[in-house]
């Protein structure tokens, strides 16, 4: 028997992307950290493919918006590149070519009846600010980010209703300072990572304060990657590992963003360990008073944790790993290409946490996706990639999201990652995520089976599922 799962009126159907992963480096005055990393170490990138052209959104955006409309998008998120928009980082002076480009993108979205969400930071710190000031370890960089935001709001604030400060800010300390998978590729820098976490929270609050002070008729939020930390067992030591992991990787951004305060248990632990961030009472007050209007949640996979069997190994230098250790759940279902567990129920668990512990703030799924390698082998006789695995992935996640909405979750949209295949940092184009395939040699776009499926979902504001009678 089939049942129609219908979503709330006005529900967002669309996808997310970012400037550094799609635009290419055309007409940019500055390099971001990813541009620099590729230029200095191209061998670190899959097949030696960098961000110089990427998906060529800088030139193809009119076609891309037309295709997005064709597959049912009513909304789309991308980002403004700090290294593109700003000519002089110290003054916040804009580059006229960048202003012209982003205005054209905004106009094209409007022409196609697509609500454009603009994000201000997607792992793309200008490399000069890392080299001169130490990047996000520096509060001067926080202030320069506010100047960048001010310029963006002055040029585009009256044209864009939905803004976000950061995409997945936790990835910056995690990838750049703790585990070395994004530039500057540092490892074991726990104390520095803790300061970066604080400074990013401060930067977000300062930009929110600025936005509201300008009297703009819109809303501003943040995009967080929430990865529920499921304990291996109900043993006290596993539960403690789960709580620490949740505090350190999720709530250290979620709490300040929505409640204006940091998790007390985490602050106490960091203080006891002598690694608490440098802060002032004035800064904490500013964070308290400038919370988000809405929340975006990126969900890909859960964390599964247990007590750390060898905590001493992670105490000098300080690392969060002394309090938890990941483990492989025997019943896990994996995406073998990306190495991530597929666990759709977590999207429901996140929704219930936001509802019950965070005032049921308006929120949306801002990314959810499945990256698959060598998708060319799934091309059918019609020349279309028949990505039924992606359709099944989305249907499972949407079914759990629908259940959460039925139970009162204030979720207003579902964005996938991503609209068209894009450059994924040092994985480049290894795993493809899009509804629309991109031929890197010709930049030709072709809608996949999942794109046609998504059009039907959007047109019907829902989809049918099989249920037992």
Residue ranges and their predicted role:
Residues 2-45, 89-90, 99-469:
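Active-site region of glycoside hydrolase catalytic domains
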Residues 23-102:
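Active-site-adjacent substrate/metal-binding segments within catalytic domains
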């Amino acid at each position: 028997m089939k049942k129609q799962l219908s979503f709330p009126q006005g529900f967002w159907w669309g996808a997310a992307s970012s400037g550094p992963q799609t635009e290419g480096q055309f007409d940019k005055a500055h390099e971001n950290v990813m541009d620099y990393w590729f230029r200095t170490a191209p061998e670190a990138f899959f097949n030696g493919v960098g961000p110089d052209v990427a998906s060529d959104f800088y030139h193809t955006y009119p076609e891309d918006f037309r295709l997005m409309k064709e597959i049912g998008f009513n909304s789309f998120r991308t980002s403004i590149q700090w290294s593109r928009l700003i000519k002089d980082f110290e003054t916040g002076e804009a580059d006229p070519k960048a202003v012209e480009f982003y205005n054209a993108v905004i106009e094209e979205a409007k022409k196609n009846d697509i609500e454009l969400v603009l994000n201000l930071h997607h792992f793309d710190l200008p490399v000069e600010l890392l080299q001169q000031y130490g990047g996000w370890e520096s509060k001067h960089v926080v202030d320069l980010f506010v100047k960048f935001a001010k310029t963006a709001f002055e040029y585009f604030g009256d044209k864009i209703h939905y803004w976000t400060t950061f995409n997945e800010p936790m990835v910056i300390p995690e990838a750049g300072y703790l585990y070395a998978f994004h530039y500057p590729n540092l490892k074991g820098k726990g104390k520095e990572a803790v300061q970066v976490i604080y400074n990013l929270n401060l930067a977000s609050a300062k930009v929110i304060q600025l936005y509201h002070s300008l009297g703009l008729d819109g809303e501003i939020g943040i995009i967080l990657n929430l990865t529920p930390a499921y304990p291996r067992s109900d043993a006290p030591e596993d539960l403690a590992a789960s709580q620490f992991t949740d505090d350190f990787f999720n709530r250290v951004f979620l709490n300040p963003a929505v409640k204006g305060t940091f998790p007390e248990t985490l602050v106490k632990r960091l203080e006891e360990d002598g690694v608490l961030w440098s802060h002032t009472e004035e800064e904490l007050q500013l964070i308290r008073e400038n919370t988000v209007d809405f929340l975006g949640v990126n969900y890909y996979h859960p964390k599964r944790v247990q007590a750390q069997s060898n905590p001493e190994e992670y105490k000098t230098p300080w690392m969060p790993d002394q309090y938890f250790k990941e483990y492989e759940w025997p019943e896990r279902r994996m995406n073998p290409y990306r190495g991530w567990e597929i666990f759709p129920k977590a999207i429901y668990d996140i929704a219930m946490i936001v509802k019950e512990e965070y005032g049921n703030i308006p929120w949306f799924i801002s990314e959810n996706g499945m990256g698959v390698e060598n998708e060319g082998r799934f091309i059918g006789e019609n020349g279309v990639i028949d990505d039924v695995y992606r359709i099944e992935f989305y249907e499972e996640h949407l079914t759990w999201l629908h259940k959460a909405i039925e139970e009162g979750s204030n979720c207003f949209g579902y964005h996938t990652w991503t609209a068209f295949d894009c450059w994924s940092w040092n994985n480049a184009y290894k795993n493809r995520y899009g509804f629309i395939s991109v031929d890197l040699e010709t930049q030709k776009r072709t809608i996949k089976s999942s794109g046609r499926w998504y059009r039907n979902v959007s047109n019907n504001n829902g989809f049918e599922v099989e249920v037992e009678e």
